């Protein structure tokens, strides 16, 4: 199941650094985290769905790259972000 447009808008408002900010790493990581959570729930009932599992691995990799970027630029911002999202890292 994908994210509804309303949920995506709420995530953008919550994690945006300023109005209209949809491209900051914080917003992108928040949206990816939501999609990863949805796919994780999907796999609890559809264990053999390997095509979607590949998509999940791509999303996790993309999120990790963005988090590494934030960590390299501003470590306190990185720590605050993973704390807010509840990511175990």
From Swiss-Prot:
Signal peptide: none
MF GO annotations: rRNA binding; structural constituent of ribosome
PROSITE patterns per UniProt: RIBOSOMAL_S15
Recorded GO CC terms: cytosolic small ribosomal subunit
Entry keyword set: Ribonucleoprotein, Ribosomal protein, RNA-binding, rRNA-binding
Domain of life according to the entry: Bacteria
SUPFAM superfamilies: S15/NS1 RNA-binding domain
NCBIfam families membership: S15_bact
Summary of subunit composition and partner proteins: Part of the 30S ribosomal subunit. Forms a bridge to the 50S subunit in the 70S ribosome, contacting the 23S rRNA.
Chain's role: One of the primary rRNA binding proteins, it binds directly to 16S rRNA where it helps nucleate assembly of the platform of the 30S subunit by binding and bridging several RNA helices of the 16S rRNA. Forms an intersubunit bridge (bridge B4) with the 23S rRNA of the 50S subunit in the ribosome.
Name of this protein: Small ribosomal subunit protein uS15
Source organism: Beijerinckia indica subsp. indica (strain ATCC 9039 / DSM 1715 / NCIMB 8712)
Taxonomic path: Bacteria, Pseudomonadati, Pseudomonadota, Alphaproteobacteria, Hyphomicrobiales
